[in-house]
Curated annotation (Swiss-Prot):
Expressed by the venom gland. It is found in: Secreted. Shows activity against E.coli and S.aureus (MIC<6.25 uM), moderate activity against P.aeruginosa (MIC<25 uM), weak activity against B.subtilis (MIC<50 uM), and has no effect against L.garvieae, C.albicans, and S.cerevisiae. Has no hemolytic nor cytolytic activity. Causes an IgE-independent histamine release. One of its GO terms (biological process) is defense response to bacterium. Belongs to the formicidae venom precursor-01 superfamily. Ant pilosulin family. This is M-myrmeciitoxin-Mb2a. Transmembrane segments: none annotated. Residues 22-48 form a propeptide. Residues 1-21 form the signal peptide. It holds the Pfam family Pilosulin. The lineage of its organism: Eukaryota, Metazoa, Ecdysozoa, Arthropoda, Hexapoda. It comes from Myrmecia banksi (Jack jumper ant). Keywords: Antibiotic, Antimicrobial, Secreted, Signal.
Amino acid sequence: MKLSCLLLTLAIIFVLTIVHAPNVKAKALADPESDAVGFADAVGEADPFDITKLNIKKLTKATCKVISKGASMCKVLFDKKKQE
């Protein structure tokens, strides 16, 4: 049961990371009337992110809240399973 709680917590962190990641747009730079040997380039543009504006305290608090809620949910499930 402890392993599944760890996996659940990691899955939640993974999903939150994907949701809060900056948007990346890919654009094809090809001639519209190109032949079958034409080329395509993908250009990614991300929002600028300044690491100095990152509030570590808020980020740490939010991460701890998510992990503690996940742990408490796992504890409740584990206790229910133990009673059965």
